[in-house]
Each structure stands twice: as C-alpha cells, then as structure tokens.
C-alpha cells in the first residue's frame, strides 16, 4: 500500500492594496479548475517591484480578513507582513517547502503579467524548484511570452493536465483558463480618490473599512 500524496496547497501573494473582487473571483475560478480546496493569501509588507502600498500592513491585513471571512476556500498567512525587508517570493516558498516536506505538491498563484517577467524575478529558478506556478489570465496581457527564447524556456515546463500539479511536488507552470476580470487596485484607488462608486468592485465589508478609515483619499 502506497502513502497517499498530500493535497495540492496553493498560496496567493500580493500587496492587496486593497483586496478586491478581481483577486477573489479569479482565484475562486482557478480553485474550481485546478481542484484546490484551500488557498492561502499571503500579503507582502515591502513589495520589491512596485511602490509602497497606500494602506499600512495592518490595514491591508484587516481588509483581507474582512474579505475572506466566512469563506472556507481562503485562509491568511501573515509571515511576509512581519518582515522589514523586501518580500522575495522565492525565499518565502523555500521556507514553505521546508515546512511541507519534499513530496507535498505546492503552488504559487500569479497573473499572466507576472509570468511575462518571471525570468527577471529574484531567484526565479529556486521558486520553481519549490513549487508549481498557477497562472491566471489578466486583461490586456498576451498569452505568449515576450521573446522566442522565453517561449522556448516555458514550453517544457508547461503542465498539460491538472493531474500533473497534484502528482508532482513542484516545477510545473499551469496556464489556467480563468475569466478575465477588468478590475485593478490602481483603478479602485483612483476611483476612491475621486469619490466614485466602488460598490461592485469590493466586498461590502472592505469598502466600509476603507470609508471608516478614510483610506485612499487625496492628500
């Protein structure tokens, strides 16, 4: 009798400034497609590739908690919020791999925009050695890599079937057929700053928190 392979575990990182329906609905669709039973949201404190968030780490943590309350798919991991140094995904996934052991299938969720620049990421090869990458489609971004060289690099790493993600511990890149959600945190912050409605873009509890704490208002 063989040991049962642990269930595929997935993490979803970002600034979540603020968390919105574009984040949540894309991951819900991905979970159905890839057969995930749980996704861990991993907010970062010091994003290495973008400006500092408009909301504090505690405020962003609170908004994530409000957004996922009562939703069994999601849980929260605050380890990156506790760092004062840049949140390198590869370092976090190395730590998670050590915690999970060598055989558990692990995955990190990214958008198509991130896949296009993946080979510029800090220690991206170590990242793929630790986990699979699950790629959600993003509006306005091509499905092909930027160069022929990058496309040749990608081809042998692509997972052709969901079962590969559950059988193997790491190393595959899965291009999910998730719906396109034309929602971005940048647009939401701009709408909030100009007092436009965001009722259909954010969970009500998150919007109420933003209004209560006067977040994303012009200086």
Swiss-Prot record:
**What EC number(s) does its UniProt record assign?**
2.7.7.18
Superkingdom to which the source organism belongs: Bacteria
Q: Which SUPFAM superfamilies match?
A: Nucleotidylyl transferase (SSF52374)
Q: In which pathway does it act?
A: Cofactor biosynthesis; NAD(+) biosynthesis; deamido-NAD(+) from nicotinate D-ribonucleotide: step 1/1
The keyword Nucleotide-binding is annotated on this UniProt entry: yes
Q: What Pfam family is a match for this entry?
A: CTP_transf_like
**Which top-level enzyme class is recorded in the Swiss-Prot or TrEMBL entry?**
transferase
Is Calcium a UniProt keyword of this protein? Answer: no
InterPro entries given in the database record: Cyt_trans-like, NadD/NMNAT, Rossmann-like_a/b/a_fold
Q: Which GO terms describe its molecular function?
A: ATP binding; nicotinate-nucleotide adenylyltransferase activity
Q: Keywords, A to Z?
A: ATP-binding, NAD, Nucleotide-binding, Nucleotidyltransferase, Pyridine nucleotide biosynthesis, Transferase
**Could you tell me what reaction this enzyme catalyses?**
nicotinate beta-D-ribonucleotide + ATP + H(+) = deamido-NAD(+) + diphosphate
GO BP terms: namely:
NAD biosynthetic process
Gene3D superfamilies in the record, alphabetically?
Answer: HUPs (3.40.50.620)
Q: What does this protein do?
A: Catalyzes the reversible adenylation of nicotinate mononucleotide (NaMN) to nicotinic acid adenine dinucleotide (NaAD).
**NCBIfam families listed in its UniProt record:** cyt_tran_rel, nicotinate (nicotinamide) nucleotide adenylyltransferase, PRK00071.1-1
Q: What family does the Swiss-Prot or TrEMBL record give for this protein? A: Belongs to the NadD family.
- Name recorded for this polypeptide: Probable nicotinate-nucleotide adenylyltransferase
**What organism does the record attribute this protein to?**
Cronobacter sakazakii (strain ATCC BAA-894) (Enterobacter sakazakii)
Query: In the UniProt record, what gene is named as encoding this protein?
Result: nadD
């Amino acid at each position: 009798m063989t040991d049962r392979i642990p269930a595929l575990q997935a993490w979803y990182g970002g600034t979540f400034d603020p968390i919105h329906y574009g984040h949540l609905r894309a991951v819900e669709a991905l979970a159905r497609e890839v057969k995930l039973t749980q996704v861990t949201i991993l907010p970062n404190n010091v994003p290495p590739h973008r400006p500092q968030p408009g909301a504090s780490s505690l405020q962003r943590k609170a908004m994530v908690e409000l957004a996922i309350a009562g939703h069994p798919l999601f849980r929260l991991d605050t380890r990156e919020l506790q760092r004062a140094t840049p949140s390198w995904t590869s370092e976090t996934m190395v730590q998670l791999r050590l915690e999970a052991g060598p055989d558990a299938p692990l995955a990190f969720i990214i958008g198509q925009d991130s896949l296009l620049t993946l080979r510029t990421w800090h220690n991206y090869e170590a990242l793929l050695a630790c986990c699979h990458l699950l790629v959600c489609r993003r509006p306005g971004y091509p499905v092909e890599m930027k160069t022929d060289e990058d496309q040749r690099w990608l081809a042998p790493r692509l997972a052709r079937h969901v079962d590969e993600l559950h059988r193997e511990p790491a190393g595959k890149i899965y291009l999910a057929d998730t719906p396109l959600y034309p929602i971005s945190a940048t647009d939401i912050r701009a709408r909030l700053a100009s007092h436009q409605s965001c009722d259909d873009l954010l969970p009500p509890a998150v919007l109420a928190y933003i209004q209560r704490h006067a977040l994303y208002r012009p200086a």
